[in-house]
Structures are given as C-alpha cells and as structure tokens.
Amino acid sequence: MSILSDFLKHPNLLQVTDGGPLVDGTNGVKGTRVVGSVSNARELRGADSLVGDVERAIIQVQETELLAEVCNTVFDVMKQNGEVIVFSQDLTTAQRKLRIAGFRVTEVAAEFPVRGIKLVNFGEKVALDLGVVADEDLIDEDGLLQEEDFEKPTGDQLKAGGCGPDDPNKKKRACKNCSCGLAEQEELEKMGQIAAEPKSSCGNCSLGDAFRCSTCPYLGQPPFKPGETVKISTVDDF
C-alpha cells in the first residue's frame, strides 16, 4: 500500500480511530500519536503542543457525524500542506467530509483510502488607492439649477392637486379618501367664507332699515332674501 508507506515515513503522524483495529504497520512507528476514541480527538484542538505539529494523519471512523467532526479537528491541528488519508467504506461521504473540513481531495483509491491535503490560501494584500479629490472635480450645486428654479411659485402652483378630473373648465373636488391635501384646503376655504360673512344678532337684517338695529352692518342696504350674498361697502361716504 504505497500511500500508507509514504505516510509512515513522517514522524509527526496522527492516527484517529473509532475503536477499531489500527492500520497494519502503524504500531511502533516513532512519533505516531494514536487517538483511540473520538471523544479524545475533540481535545486535540486545545492541545497547544499538537496544534500545527501534525504533518500526516490517518482517520479510521465509519460513523458519518463523527467522521465530520474528526476531519474538522485534524484540519485545525495539521500543518500547512499536511496530508490526510481516510479509510472508509463510503468513499463519497469521505470525500465530502474532507472537502467540508477544508481539505482538497487529491486521490481516491480503488480500495478504501481517500487522500486529501491542507491548502490554505490567504491571498495577497492589495493596497487600496483612494486617490485625491481635486477642487476642480467638485460640482457647484448652484450651477445645476435653472432660471425657473429661482422663481417664486404662485398661489395656484402651491394649491394641492391630484383629486377630481383634469378638465381645466371644471373645479376639482376632493375625493372620499383624499390624501393629497385638497380636502384640507377646501375646509380652510370654507371656514374662511363663514368667518367673512357678517353675523346677524337680531335676525332682521334682511327686512330693511326700518327693522334693523343701530349696529347692523347692512344699514343703508336694500332688503334682501335670507341667505343671499350681499356685498357690504367698507368705504365711508363724506
């Protein structure tokens, strides 16, 4: 078995099993660390003396979940460019678990072992060129405005729009669920008209001067129908 023979040449060899027999030829190899249970393999990550010291590893774990955990552990303690072989009856699962742990699968034998290598590429540092912004590259915000942008809007332009028909000959009316502000505008106009209309205290303003009180705002005006709009002159006659 050439793969195994190559591994046995390295003194920093780690072998993890799930309690089964060891691979033939690993007994008595100088520098070989044998972990006979997966529970002990979990403690490898905390062993400062072992982290980064393993060059080769042999994994003999058949249970899928335990195999994934062992592969992760071996990857953490292994040196860069270190190699691992997994003896498993399910070659597809062994390849997948190695790749998930971070290994690159390099060889799949016709028998049981799957071979992988630890390659960690941190990439190259790239200097960021933020550049220098010159004053001439700055945009004058006032230069983006047109002449009409400086004109004061008229009252009609400030009025709310959006409700009613677009026919210019028809006055727009606020819709039932008005949200454009036209309903509030109509309400304010209505309140202004009510406030502008003179209040009658005696109720006889429309009957004529003979029935009006001395402070009636309609003194001097001809009789009119109740509810009829009457314009009152605010200029005194001299």
From Swiss-Prot:
Belongs to the anamorsin family. One of its GO terms (molecular function) is metal ion binding. The C-terminal domain binds 2 Fe-S clusters but is otherwise mostly in an intrinsically disordered conformation. GO terms for biological process: iron-sulfur cluster assembly. Residues 202-216 are annotated as: Fe-S binding site B. The keyword Cytoplasm applies. Its cofactor is [2Fe-2S] cluster; [4Fe-4S] cluster. Residues 1-121 are annotated as: N-terminal SAM-like domain. Residues 121-150 are annotated as: Linker. One of its GO terms (cellular component) is mitochondrial intermembrane space. It is found in: Cytoplasm; Mitochondrion intermembrane space. This is Anamorsin homolog. A motif (Cx2C motif 2) lies at residues 213-216. The keyword Heme does not apply. HAMAP family: Anamorsin (MF_03115). [4Fe-4S] cluster binds at C202, C205, C213, C216. [2Fe-2S] cluster binds at C163, C175, C178, C180. It comes from the Eukaryota. Keywords: 2Fe-2S, 4Fe-4S, Cytoplasm, Iron, Iron-sulfur, Metal-binding, Mitochondrion. Component of the cytosolic iron-sulfur (Fe-S) protein assembly (CIA) machinery. Required for the maturation of extramitochondrial Fe-S proteins. Part of an electron transfer chain functioning in an early step of cytosolic Fe-S biogenesis, facilitating the de novo assembly of a [4Fe-4S] cluster on the cytosolic Fe-S scaffold complex. Electrons are transferred from NADPH via a FAD- and FMN-containing diflavin oxidoreductase. Residues 163-180 are annotated as: Fe-S binding site A. Monomer. A motif (Cx2C motif 1) lies at residues 202-205.
